[in-house]
A protein has these predicted regions:
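Short strand-turn-strand beta-turns centered on an Asx-Gly dipeptide
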Residues: 146-152, 252-254, 298, 324
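Extracellular recognition modules
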Residues: 178-180, 290-294
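Surface beta-strand/loop "capping" patches
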Residues: 212-242, 588-600
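Short glycine/proline/serine/threonine-rich loop/turn segments at secondary-structure transition edges
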Residues: 127-130, 170-174, 275-288
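Low-complexity, Pro/Ser/Thr- and charge-rich linker/hinge segments at domain boundaries
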Residues: 202-219, 311-326
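Accessory beta-strand-rich segments of carbohydrate-active enzymes
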Residues: 2-6, 11-14, 37-38, 52-56, ...
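Beta-strand-rich binding/interaction modules
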Residues: 145-147, 230-263, 269-271, 291
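Extended substrate-binding grooves/exosites of carbohydrate-active enzymes
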Residues: 1-39, 77, 87-90, 95, ...
Length: 600
């Protein structure tokens, strides 16, 4: 294998990928945008469904597989979104800390499995004069994209979207998209989370066909004035080919328009609104407003966008966490995107089940362990009312295995302090913020999980501060420098330690990003923890580990089903049943322990 390839170089984070932006779907009219049903937009085309699929354990790609005339008669059909292991290609592997491949960064084994995808799509004639973008919301593995036989681009980072402009690669009528997914890459070393190792295109794939003049990004900063009474909205819209166009802004409270205005289109349009006596967003009162932005050319609407926003202000002062001037406590959980039958694919009914259960259990906060969750999950948190600690797709826990196995205090490899990996770290943080910044539910950003601490975290912190100064930043690994975390963040402290910290004069709030491990008969001591949390203002709460068991539903020869865990598929190395350690069973049936969580 060529060890100088794109997927074994951490300084190559992408090739010809579009800059990160918010999740935004275009519509032809404001009435369409109001319904918020993207499937009915003439500017949207889903590529979910059956794709032609080829898998190679050795990473062998048939020559010319991306070509229009290549024969796929001996290929299989695979549903997208999906993880190929869940359809019998390769096996699921569960490991918590130990890397699934030998630690030799940035290199990966020569026998690196590859999954090849092909699908035809029809480009409507109405799209021929506009711009066309191809979007992948999540691909586990480093991947190349081809359209009609030509290479379009390349991307990494499993839980972040990748968008490519394909205007110059497509034509009216039938077109071919092909995707080449490499299971392991240098990115594997930064995605060592405690979960099943699964591969492939596991989130939505779709096309956007928009007018030449259109909104590329729409950032809405909705905060409060110093009295916490009036809303202050700053909108920044990036417009492609803005010449001669106008933007019309309308802010709705339900059906009532509370503000309307207009501005000439520019490359970036900044628009500010003050909303008297605004309805504020909190987890208990998730009031939202609809921001409608229409692009007008010649007085006619050519594109309509709509963003749901919430007015709130997050502050750290007096050693406490405040939302809208009120000190709050976070009764949280850690949540993975997981499904017992589909792996990392999360159907809407599963997401709804999660949010409804959380509200019933008096959960008010979710840490997206340990990567940005499906964007639809954040929509539900906005709507139902859950505070979110949004976490960068970053963990390199296995780099310290030498310390645990030999007693050596050093690490096998210091990713977080290595300049060669700085770009990859910052790329992950930047893309998270750029995707999720409009969600009112997000009250803190996280620099990742169990990745120790180094200058790369300081660079992440600085970049997030540039992009969004309105929210605090959390990182548990910054234990000594205190440069990259606005709260003291800890894991699994004893109750006595928590009480001692409550009495400390440290100026930062104290947050347990993981505590009360729920495995077996856990979680324990929740009543004692919460007696301390309520007593001491500095203690702002924590997130129980974890929300739902990761057991995989398996059918036996007798027709019975059971939940499999690490090692049940012959996967090595594995961490056994450590993936079934939550408040709920894999099918979301609550464990008996949820009573302790609800009543704490």
């Amino acid at each position: 294998m060529n060890r100088n390839c794109d997927w074994q170089n951490p300084e190559i984070t992408q090739i010809d990928r579009e800059p990160a932006r918010v999740t935004l779907f275009p519509y032809a009219t404001e009435a369409q945008a109001k319904k918020a049903q993207r499937a009915f937009s003439p500017y949207y085309k889903s590529l979910n469904g059956s794709w032609d699929f080829y898998y190679s354990d050795e990473g062998v790609c048939p020559d010319g597989f991306e070509a229009v005339g290549f024969g796929v008669e001996d290929w299989d059909a695979l549903d997208v979104p999906g993880n190929w292991q869940m359809s019998g290609y390769d096996i699921p592997q569960y490991t918590n800390v130990v890397y699934p491949i030998p630690l030799d960064p940035p290199f990966v084994p020569d026998d690196n499995p590859v999954g090849l995808y092909r699908r035809w799509f029809h480009l409507p004639s109405t799209w021929k004069d506009g711009r066309v973008y191809l979007n992948f919301d999540g691909v586990n593995g480093a991947f190349y994209v081809y359209v009609n036989g030509a290479k379009v681009g390349f991307s990494k980072v499993s839980h972040m979207p990748a968008e490519f402009e394909i205007t110059n690669f497509v034509h009216e009528g039938e077109n071919l998209v092909a995707v080449e997914v490499h299971k392991w890459s240098d990115a594997t070393y930064l995605e060592d989370q405690d979960f099943w190792r699964l591969s492939g295109i596991f989130r939505d794939v779709y096309l956007l066909g928009v007018p030449q003049t259109h909104i590329r990004d729409l950032r809405a900063d909705a905060t409060l004035d110093e009295s916490y009474e009036d809303g202050l909205l700053t909108v920044c819209a990036d417009v492609t080919s803005p010449e001669g166009a106008k933007l019309a802004f309308t802010l709705y409270d339900g059906e009532k328009a509370v503000h309307t205005g207009c501005a000439d289109a520019e490359a970036t349009v900044k628009y500010e609104v003050r909303v008297p006596a605004v309805k504020k967003w909190t987890a208990e009162t998730p009031n939202r407003y609809a921001l409608a932005v229409n692009v007008l050319s010649g007085g006619e609407v050519i594109e309509a966008a709509r963003v749901m926003i919430g007015f709130k202000k997050v502050e750290i002062r007096d050693r406490q966490l405040f939302v809208n001037g009120v000190s709050i406590k976070l009764k949280g959980v850690n949540r993975h995107d997981t499904h017992s039958q589909l792996g990392h694919v999360t159907p809407m009914e599963s997401l709804l089940r999660d949010v409804q259960l959380m509200k019933r259990m008096n959960v008010n906060c979710v840490r997206t362990s340990h990567y940005p969750n499906d964007p639809r999950w954040l929509d539900l948190c906005d709507e139902y009312g859950l505070y979110v600690v949004d976490e960068t797709d970053l963990e390199c826990h296995g780099a310290q295995m030498g310390k645990w196995m030999t007693g050596d205090e050093g690490m096998v490899f210091d990713f977080s302090g290595s300049p060669e990996w700085k770009k990859a770290y910052v790329d992950r943080a930047e893309r998270m913020v750029c995707r999720d910044r409009n969600h009112p539910s997000i009250i803190m950003w996280s620099l990742g999980n169990e990745s120790f601490y180094g200058e790369n975290h300081a660079a992440m912190y600085a970049r997030i501060r540039e992009l969004d100064p309105s929210r605090p930043i959390h990182y548990e690994g910054d234990r000594e420098n205190h440069q990259s975390s606005d709260v003291v963040s800890v894991m699994y402290p004893a109750v006595e330690v928590v009480i001692r910290e409550g009495e400390s004069d440290d100026p930062r709030p104290y947050f347990m990003c993981e505590y009360a491990h729920a495995m077996g008969l856990g979680p324990g001591s929740l009543e004692e923890y919460w007696q301390a949390i309520y007593k001491y203002p500095r203690l702002i709460g924590g997130c129980v580990w974890e929300w739902v068991d990761h057991g995989m539903e398996v059918l036996t020869e007798d027709g019975e089903t059971y939940y499999a865990y690490g090692g049940d598929f012959g996967d090595t190395p594995n961490d056994g049943n450590f993936c079934v350690d939550a408040l709920n069973y894999p099918d979301r049936t609550p464990h008996t322990s949820v009573g302790a969580q609800k009543g704490a």
